[in-house]
């Protein structure tokens, strides 16, 4: 069936979203064009602004329009002396919803994966090491995902912390092994944070 080139382009663009296949993309495109053109325009404007204006926080690497995010510039968070290391900005959102953590974060934007050529510098561990050396930190909470790669990353960071005399702890495994942190419910995540344990080498 022949379709409008612009419609085809729209459907192909929508497929860049996770979990969106050809049928879902077609349904989304038709819905926007048939029933909600104003919503489609708002979506286009929001996407354009987000893609051009949102960058990474200079300290924690999460998404922000500012040089530093609101969490990193909060004096109370700075005095806390704790940094929670996570794999993605979505993990920060999940932890913040529990209300159980009052420190700052560091976002790896991934995890160590030697088979894929992803080493320490590729996930910002050189920058984390700079913070370990420069800031009076009390504890690094390792909240990487409970996967093989996440555990390897946590162990690497714990060894790094030991070199600088900073305590490293791992969140408890109330989080299901093999799961993604952003998909865990708030109660389970609260128990995981409360039950974290110290990692020693």
Swiss-Prot record:
UniProt record similarity statement: Belongs to the RecR family.
Keyword set includes Ribosomal protein: no
Record GO biological process: DNA recombination; DNA repair
Keyword Zinc-finger: yes
Family annotation (CDD domains): TOPRIM_recR (cd01025)
One Pfam family in the UniProt entry: Toprim_4
HAMAP family: RecR
Matching PROSITE patterns: RECR, TOPRIM
InterPro entries in the record: DNA_Rcmb_RecR, Rcmb_RecR, Rcmb_RecR_Znf, TOPRIM_dom, TOPRIM_RecR
NCBIfam families assigned to the protein according to its UniProt record, in alphabetical order: recR
Zinc finger map (C4-type): 57-72
Keyword list, A-Z: DNA damage, DNA recombination, DNA repair, Metal-binding, Zinc, Zinc-finger
Role played: May play a role in DNA repair. It seems to be involved in an RecBC-independent recombinational process of DNA repair. It may act with RecF and RecO.
Protein name per Swiss-Prot or TrEMBL: Recombination protein RecR
